Amino acid sequence: MTNEEALAKINGRLTFGMKPGLRRIKQLLEELDNPQKKLKFVHVAGTNGKGTTCALTASVLRQAGYTVGLYTSPYVEDFRERFQINGEMIPPEELAQEVELLSPIAEAHDAVGDTVTEFEFITALAFHWFARRQCDIVVLEVGLGGRFDATNAIDAPEAAVIASISLDHTAILGDTLDKIAFEKAGIVKPGGRLVLYPWQAEGIVEQLRGICEERGAELILPDTRYQVLEESLEGTVFQTGGETLRTPFLGEHQVRNAVTARTALEVLRRRGWRIPDGAIREGFAKAFLPARMEVLSTAPLCLLDGGHNPGCAAALRDALERFVPQRKVGIMGVMADKDSHEALRLLAPLFAEIITIAPDNPRALPAEELARTAGEFCPRVRPAQTCGEAVARAMKAMGPGDALIVCGSFYLAGEIRDQLKGKLANLQPDRLPQKM
């Protein structure tokens, strides 16, 4: 089986949609001899911030000398970004081997009407690959929610982490914060340990405290006292617990995510993991997360952000107001199932001009519809039919010293990255996961 055939097999499962529940994934794993039981995990849920928390935690553990698996989503340019060991993507031939092994098992379920979803398939694949490669520990990002997410087929992790909780995927997870928090709390196992991002909406911390008490789990809340010492487009230096740390990430929310990750690492230390202070400093400084306020170019300034809900939009607005005072041109594309009106209300007034585009995804909002909404908040908005057209229009609209901001969807970020690379000078070094 070739890599292309493997990807086609995986993508073919997208037609089976989303079917929350753990029965199918547990059956798949049982037929693979339960690879997840041979692994240790840090399990991370949350609406916003879980990607940063995963990236920081995995980076530190790698600096500490461990073989670290990372399972995350979404990808930006290459599907294989979702499966990494020590910062390197699964090789094409190994992805093909895993798909070839798993396909007959999944197809047997399909044949009796118990179809295996794409996420269940790739989660089982990830566990099997990480176990085969003998990872010391895996940083595991929840796909959606937590309670019925396929990643929750694991036993109690070394640490569970819940990042910031806000309204998203309300049709599936519920239309109130307490309903969504309950779903996220599904990753808390009896007798386990939960590190909870403490800057939650009112009532969420107490709700999670009660759930932990019911399950005999320990709740660990990070110290909310920290001090930002320096911040720029190059990153942030902050102090927490007498320790000075630097991350390449922008915004106060990212400092809070880093404080949460730092607390999770302390829980691992208590569990016997050897994590020197130097590994924490180096790991935080070297962590990378594509398309999260990523500086793609410095002259002209180009920022790439895949955030897709109002919470992400608010964080991006804050960063733009603080770090990007110059005239801004935007390229925006969103999914139809997201609250684009609220995101545009927050962001669009900052732009002199916006070009809208529909990302290459069946759920994408048409560019014309997005342009109509954006036009309520920005004086000049034009739809484009292709990424190439959007980039060309944006570059034409920019004057000397202007900034280009690409935002609204990870699907858009991945599509447009190569288009921008061919047209921007002073590109930052490409830090996407390396190929094995």
Regions found by a protein language model. Give the residues of each.
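Acidic, Mg2+-coordinating active-site environments of NTP-dependent enzymes
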Residues: H109-D110, Q134-E141, P157-T244, A258, ...
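ATP-dependent carboxylate-amine ligase catalytic core
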Residues: L22, K26-K37, Q63-D155, A171-L173
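N-terminal leader/targeting and accessory segments in enzymes
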Residues: M1-N48, T52-T67, V76-D78, R193-A201, ...
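Short, flexible loop segments at boundaries between secondary-structure elements
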Residues: P359-N361, L427-M436
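Beta-strand->loop->alpha-helix junctions that form or flank phosphate-binding loops
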Residues: Y71, L196-W199, I211-S232, P248-E252, ...
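C-terminal helical cap/extension that packs against the catalytic core
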Residues: P198-I220, S232-E234, L301-C302, P310, ...
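Nucleotide phosphate-binding/pyrophosphate-handling subdomain across enzymes
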Residues: K38, I137-L140, F148-V161, I165-H169, ...
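Active-site-proximal loop/hinge segments that shape catalytic or ion-binding/gating pockets
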Residues: S409
